[in-house]
Amino acid sequence: METYKTILFTSNLSENSRYAFTHVTLMARSFGSKIILLHVIDEIPGQLQYRISKLYGEARWKEMLDSHMKEAKRALTGKVSSKKMIQVALKGFCDEEGLSIAEGGVAGHEVIIKEGDVAKTILEQSALNHCDLIVMGASKGLLNGTAVGNNIKSVLKGAKVPVIVVPPAPVG
């Protein structure tokens, strides 16, 4: 039977990610694996940035971006940076599962936060960290089904290792 030494878990910090993480910890405990928790902050596509900056002007666009970031930080975390807030949320995932380094049969865990294209960053981090498995959580579809978005499709297409997509938690 194949064993997974390093599992890359991708999270968007949603309830679906939290549910998927419970399965990741079960696998990690079964295999004695290390878990890498990855959160990618999606970038605004360059072409869209260009169009908006031309519409409003470069200075106004930068001002809008700065204002948006400040408001988002204030709304979500007060004075805590967005990266710190994400680290706290990911640590909360670990705490809920009773996961700490070298505890409970898990070889360890690491939290990585990156900015960029989500699928590309997941594939890059999988290779850089020599991951044997990628685990992603699907989201709930519009009509109570499971939605597999473009990021999951791109990772499935480009992955060099197995990818597990965990459906959303059953309702009820």
Task: Outline where the language-model segments fall.
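Glycine-rich, Arg-bearing micro-motifs that act as flexible, cationic patches
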Residues: 116, 133-158, 168-172
